[in-house]
């Protein structure tokens, strides 16, 4: 009944966890239905196929799923050899309901081998059901792999296997002891010069100068390498278990930009990086969704894969703040507005430790189900998966700026991702240390980003965020690239920006001119900023953070580059437009995240003559290139333009 109801919602694929802890009876002994019929996951997969559904499998090893120990066997999490370690060598505890537990180490060879053994056993029952022989069309590797939410820069991982990987990371990066010593500000011939074989990672933030920052930024980068290596090990184990010929996915958690997850680094093992979304309807949530989804969308478009939400909330766990149906509808429509092209409804069917799904545990539809039926019909009507949101402006945040914010986080084990989810950033959560620069770098950079984003939104300029790790895929097609610099910029990224400038793209840096490398190492040669001026005579390459300068730069770019705008009145309403392959505007989203009920006016250009609300069935005329209609508080309208 539950599968029938899922199909009736308009969903084509069912996503299922396979919890290691549920299937393990003893070390190396697994039950996939031979003893307990409820554990027959292969039967469930075959039944889904009979119903015309395809299947995504999520075997972890970390699955969360609101399960105790996140689906990892108790014997594994309490095995000292498997546990992540704090700077003092203690287990790293996650204070999670119903019971706190020590999180596994992504570097632990014992843990990685234990997970591989589970995958091999699972492959014996599910690999024969992989497409095209069966309905399994994708497999997810791990889950929200941000160090089990204990992702503070100095929380972990000081496990012996992690320390060994850290030292190898430094060998690979610096090649020689002389280069390592020079990078860390030591005399290579001095008695205190660091050595690859016994160097210890930093255990707290103690930098007092840009030179001191280098080893801290390296430690933050190592976390990214650690996770990427673990994902590769998991992916290899799944391949060895027979899960071949289908894409592998991984879901980044809310606040992913504040974690060590790096989409570019996992690209070798993960085919589809998606995001998870859980939000209360609000203007803050809209801004967060815009930032996250625009970054995801431009990356995925460049890579030729759909921008996918691995989880988008329909309901909530009982130990989280409640999300009602309006919150879920607002979140889903806002993600679509900023470029999402597919989503996994979490949860479609209610279960233990979950409240508010559109289908009850007996397979009966709740009133909430009607929205999803209407949404599927609306998406099909406009062929939404073949439309795209043009974003001629790209706000580029280099990876080293994000690493710097991680190591300067001021709240210890309280994850920076928590602040990000709440709409806060470096201004609220990072140390204001000036490090001898005369200004607080991460705070000033965050202020610059917010000021620029606000100015672009007020004028209705479509833009997207880009992480520096995506510099090789997410900058093509941009008319204006604004790259954040708090005083440092890597030579590699500078060359990429210079190439864009040579191709005619307007390139701006701000709020500071970069005099150091991205990790705050001294540059062998200063950046020649004149190379960024290129074809745009009179263009000021470096833009300060003061609002008046930012406003002037945005106004100038609109005129100079003839940027299209979708300005709204009042300006707390936001518009996004999606075009077809011919560049014709086909779908307009209007978003009101505030508490105010309003009549809004939006400029849509000379083409459209009417707008049809795809969810409510109402038609509105477009007069003189403008559309006027009512938008209720905390709602989104999805309109087909004709």
Residue ranges and their predicted role:
Residues 3-8, 49-50, 130, 263-268, ...:
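Acidic (Asp/Glu)-rich catalytic clusters
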């Amino acid at each position: 009944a539950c599968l029938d109801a899922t199909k009736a919602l308009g969903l084509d694929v069912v996503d299922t966890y396979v919890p290691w802890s549920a299937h393990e009876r003893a070390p190396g002994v697994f039950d996939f239905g031979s003893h307990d019929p409820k554990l027959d996951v292969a039967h469930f997969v075959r039944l889904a196929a009979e119903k015309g559904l395809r299947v995504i499998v999520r075997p972890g090893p970390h699955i969360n799923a609101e399960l105790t120990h996140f689906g990892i066997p108790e014997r594994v999490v309490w095995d000292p050899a498997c546990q992540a370690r704090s700077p003092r060598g203690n287990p790293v505890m996650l204070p999670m309901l119903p019971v706190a537990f020590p999180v596994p180490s992504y570097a632990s060879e014992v843990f990685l081998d234990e997970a591989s053994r589970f995958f091999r056993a699972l492959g014996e029952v599910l690999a024969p059901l992989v497409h095209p022989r069966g309905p399994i069309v994708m497999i997810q590797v791990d889950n929200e792999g941000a160090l089990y939410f204990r992702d503070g820069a100095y929380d972990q991982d000081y496990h012996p296997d992690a320390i060994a990987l850290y030292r190898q990371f430094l060998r690979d990066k610096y090649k020689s002891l002389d280069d390592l010593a020079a990078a860390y500000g030591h005399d290579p011939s001095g008695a205190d010069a660091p050595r690859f074989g016994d160097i210890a990672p930093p255990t707290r933030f103690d930098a007092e100068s840009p030179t001191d920052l280098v080893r801290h930024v390296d430690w933050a980068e190592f976390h990214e390498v650690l996770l990427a290596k673990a994902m590769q090990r998991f992916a290899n184990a799944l391949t060895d278990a027979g899960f071949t010929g289908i894409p592998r996915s991984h879901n980044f958690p809310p606040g992913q930009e504040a974690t060590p997850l790096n989409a570019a680094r996992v690209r070798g093992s993960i085919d589809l990086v998606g995001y998870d979304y859980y939000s209360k309807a609000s203007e803050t949530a809209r801004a967060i969704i815009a930032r996250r989804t625009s970054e995801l969308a431009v990356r995925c478009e460049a890579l030729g894969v759909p921008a996918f939400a691995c989880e988008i909330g329909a309901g909530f766990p009982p130990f989280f703040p409640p999300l009602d149906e309006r919150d879920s509808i607002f979140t889903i429509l806002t993600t679509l507005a900023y470029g999402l092209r597919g989503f996994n409804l979490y949860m479609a069917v209610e279960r233990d430790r979950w409240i508010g799904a559109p289908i009850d545990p007996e397979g009966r539809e709740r009133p909430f189900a009607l929205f999803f039926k209407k949404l599927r019909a609306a998406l099909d009507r406009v062929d939404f998966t073949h439309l795209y949101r043009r974003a001629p402006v790209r706000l580029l945040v280099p990876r080293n700026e994000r690493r710097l914010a991680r190591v300067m986080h001021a709240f210890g084990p309280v994850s920076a991702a928590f602040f990000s989810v709440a709409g806060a950033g470096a201004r609220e959560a990072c140390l204001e240390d000036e490090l001898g620069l005369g200004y607080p770098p991460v705070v000033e950079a965050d202020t610059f980003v917010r000021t620029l984003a606000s100015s672009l939104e007020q004028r209705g300029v479509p833009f997207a965020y880009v992480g520096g790790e995506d510099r090789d895929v997410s900058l093509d097609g941009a008319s204006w690239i604004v790259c954040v610099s708090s005083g440092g910029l890597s030579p590699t990224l500078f060359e990429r920006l210079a190439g864009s400038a040579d191709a005619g793209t307007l390139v701006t840096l701000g709020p500071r001119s970069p005099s150091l490398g991205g990790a705050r190492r001294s540059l062998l040669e200063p950046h020649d900023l004149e190379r960024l001026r290129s074809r745009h005579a009179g263009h000021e390459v470096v833009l300060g953070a003061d609002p008046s300068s930012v406003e002037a730069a945005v106004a100038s770019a609109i005129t100079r580059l003839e940027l299209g705008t979708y300005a709204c009145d009042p300006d707390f309403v936001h518009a996004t437009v999606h075009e077809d392959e011919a560049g014709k505007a086909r779908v307009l989203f209007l978003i009101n995240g505030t508490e105010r009920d309003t009549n809004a006016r939006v400029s849509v250009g000379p083409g459209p003559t009417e707008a049809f609300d795809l969810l409510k069935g109402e038609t509105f005329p477009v007069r003189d290139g403008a559309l006027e209609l009512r938008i209720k508080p905390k709602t989104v309208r999805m309109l087909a333009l004709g």
